[in-house]
Amino acid sequence: MKVVNLKQAILQAWKERWSDYQWAINMKKFFPKGATWDILNLAEALLEQAMIGPSPNPLILSYLKYAISSQMVSYSSVLTAISKFDDFSRDLCVQALLDIMDMFCDRLSCHGKAEECIGLCRALLSALHWLLRCTAASAERLQEGLEAGSAVTGEKQLALCLQCLEKTLSSTKNRALLHIAKLEEASSWTAIEHCLLKLGEILANLSNPQLRSQAEHCGTLIRSIPTMLSVHSEQLHKTGFPTIHALILLEGTMNLTGEMQPLVEQLMMVKRMQHIPTPLFVLEIWKACFVGLIESPEGTQELKWTAFTYLKIPQVLVKLKKYFHGDKDFTEDVNCAFEFLLKLTPLLDKADQRCNCDCTNFLLQECNKQGLLSEASFASLVSKRTADRDPQLKSSENANIQPNPGLILRAEPTVTNILKTMDADHSKSPEGLLGVLGHMLSGKSLDLLLAAAAATGKLKSFARKFINLNEFTTHGSGESTKTASVRALLFDISFLMLCHVAQTYGSEVILSESSSGEEVPFFETWMQTCMPEEGKILNPDHPCFRPDSTKVESLVALLNNSSEMKLVQMKWHEACLSISAAILEILNAWENGVLAFESIQKITDNIKGKVCSLAVCAVAWLVAHVRMLGLDEREKSLQMIRQLAGPLYSENTLQFYNERVVIMNSILEHMCADVLQQTATQIKFPSTGVDTMPYWNLLPPKRPIKEVLTDIFAKVLEKGWVDSRSIHILDTLLHMGGVYWFCNNLIKELLKETRKEHTLRAVQLLYSIFCLDMQQVTLVLLGHILPGLLTDSSKWHSLMDPPGTALAKLAVWCALSSYSSHKGQASSRQKKRHREDIEDYISLFPVEDMQPSKLMRLLSSNEDDASILSSPTDRSMNSSLSASQLHTVNMRDPLNRVLANLFLLISSVLGSRTAGPHTQFVQWFMEECVDCLEQDSRGSILQFMPFTTVSELVKVSAMSSPKVVLAITDLSLPLGRQVAAKAIAAL
């Protein structure tokens, strides 16, 4: 039907003076069913006829108002029609249009299709642009009127415009619709921003303060539309944040060599999720560092903590600085954190007493050097600490003992110098290089240098240089006795250092990412196949322990007949590989009575008399051999280990022997620890006065590990923070019981908790404990434990508040952390996932879209959930279609599969006819997702949520807010915007 007929109908009504309801009845008679009034452009036609003269036609306007009230026309068609009027000089027409907008601008709605809802968003954007243009025109007229002395009309119209603007923008729902429209039509939004700037310039000269403040308020509301989702309130009432504390302790204790970026991202993630103010965030990092310094065991661990605090954490803060806007603000926050820290005098005094120095002063100097503090702040903080410091500490400081912080800070440049020295050609000045390495072995120099290298990310480079040196010394040709002894020493020192690094910092530091064509260096080969490590079982009959028999025979003869080991032309790597078979020959001879104990003593002296590496290789094989022997067969092998670890009975003739023996004994003690515990044997290693393995064998004997787990968690919860020892016990339990056992039992403990403040603390602590292996724990928690709780009605009671809220919070935190980091590198402390685990997830959540997963078959027992199992051939709005599918996320990844299936389960729970604690749990889960989100949900875990879930969620009263809808939908996708517009327009 043509518009001309519509126009004729309107004119006929006007001529015959029909009342509004009479007009509506006749209109429905004139126009048959089928075409809607919006398609016929009724609103536009009525406005066109009403606005022909200098003043609006009241009768035709009454028809339009009736059409709006009776929903003959949609709000979007009326707004679009209004925004086409641009003769702002006709005051009465403008006022009439503002009156019409005033009727409905704060109660817009649309219950039609998604396209119609998007149409409403666009129409509202056009109407906002029209209102701004109208306001600007009114303000200009007011200024002209002021100059001419007749300002009353202009002021009245401007007041009406601002009133309508304020009423439209005060509605959160309208701002949410405008947020969607802005993403749909970026050019229109740019026009609005230009209009806003122009309006600001005009209104700046306005004398009426009330109108000016009203205009400023409207401007603020418009400018807030693009950032609607980024406003979070920070927790200003809290002072302790155990998650940050535990994360720092975990990194400092177990992951000194880890890269900084993953730690920085994890800290920022926790800061965002828990809304921690920056000064308190930095303060918590410092507090954890000082606690670590105080409680770290003496020796290597103490040096590791010192390096972590003084070298790594300042660098971490430098990286964190980039996440904050404005350097000045961040330095003020760091200064504020130190101001708070200085009030914790007992903590700082205890650290000073432990480290034999003013720890805070060293830290302030380092932060000042890194540009984290201004000079004025630095001077002020130093003077405050000096004034507050316990005077007895200064007098009790031992001038003969150099404090660790000072030593570590001096060790850092030394590491760089050593790396440069190691780059030189080894063949030119081996004696000079030996001198450098000899100094490294004295006292605690080696551990200091390694800690400094680990904290600054140079340890891998350090190890690589020593592997190259070790490789260089394996062969000697045409050498003198002196050259041969230097070569032997360089081989020995590099070998011992590399073993020490592998045991202290993990073997992954040593391993290179060598390409398939390259030859693997000797030390790497030996370490991977022959070196005992915790949890690594070696086969004593492995081919690596069975080299060429002629080499073995000559080595046995050399050990048995010579008074001492020969050095010239000695191929040390071959000797190291042959020693295991030689030891087996010697053991057999001893057991069969061919050799006496005195001969064994002479042989063991020969083995360790010149080159300690041979003793290390011998014990490595003996440890593997002892495991395979019966109780009554072990004595001789253990006796031989004792001999190799004991003092030398003959004279040693090579340099740095005592220093090398100290490292050798530490290596042997680490190697033998597991087997000695399993065989209930004791071997006394020469003591250095320091516990070389402070965190080994912490589990109490003869107690079930579940008891140990619940006990340690109860203690940690009571205390409110995790200490280093507890971290190591929990790590041992995780590897002993497995991820499912560990996670399941800790979640059971959380669900037992009924005190609200305790559940929140438990969540913060559990999250940090789960960081021991966050990826694996998240897969278990979201893929097994939560589905089990949500699908079993007998367990629903455990999801009541407060433990249910706490579990929802924990699940979201784990999901967000794992998802944000799983594309990056896994932390070096996290064990690599086995292939079969991945297969488990594939079978639980199959790859093929057409094949419903085990989990979804389980859910489809609900009679009203069959739609979930429909095959996604209809891609327009299938019940399981989510943003992740439109972004083509890799669904072979176990975490992506688990998230997708969890959100399908959530959708199923919301759509089910049975409500209960599980429904409430889903609501808390979604609320936490919204609370933790960044500006938009693209790339977050919510992209796995089916689009259909949005309409189910808004039925839950707590979730029926426009901001929530914006937060949970992926607005970067047209389909996401349609879903959001439909849900918001229906609110």
UniProtKB/Swiss-Prot annotation:
| Compartments reported by the entry | Nucleus
Q: Where is this motif: LXXLL motif 2?
A: 344-348
Q: Which Pfam families match?
A: Med24_N
**One of the GO biological process terms:** somatic stem cell population maintenance
Q: Which UniProt keywords apply?
A: Activator, Nucleus, Phosphoprotein, Repeat, Transcription, Transcription regulation
Gene Ontology MF, one:
nuclear thyroid hormone receptor binding
The record's section on InterPro entries has:
Mediator_Med24 (IPR021429)
Q: Where is this motif: LXXLL motif 5?
A: 786-790
Segments carrying motif LXXLL motif 3: 446-450
Q: Does the keyword Repeat apply?
A: yes
Q: Where is this motif: LXXLL motif 1?
A: 128-132
Motif window: LXXLL motif 6: 855-859
Q: Residues where Phosphoserine occurs?
A: S860, S871
Please give an example of a GO cellular component term from this record.
ubiquitin ligase complex
Location of the motif LXXLL motif 4: 555-559
**Family in the record:** Belongs to the Mediator complex subunit 24 family.
SUBUNIT field = Component of the Mediator complex, which is composed of MED1, MED4, MED6, MED7, MED8, MED9, MED10, MED11, MED12, MED13, MED13L, MED14, MED15, MED16, MED17, MED18, MED19, MED20, MED21, MED22, MED23, MED24, MED25, MED26, MED27, MED29, MED30, MED31, CCNC, CDK8 and CDC2L6/CDK11. The MED12, MED13, CCNC and CDK8 subunits form a distinct module termed the CDK8 module. Mediator containing the CDK8 module is less active than Mediator lacking this module in supporting transcriptional activation.
Function, as annotated: Component of the Mediator complex, a coactivator involved in the regulated transcription of nearly all RNA polymerase II-dependent genes. Mediator functions as a bridge to convey information from gene-specific regulatory proteins to the basal RNA polymerase II transcription machinery. Mediator is recruited to promoters by direct interactions with regulatory proteins and serves as a scaffold for the assembly of a functional preinitiation complex with RNA polymerase II and the general transcription factors.
The molecule here is called Mediator of RNA polymerase II transcription subunit 24
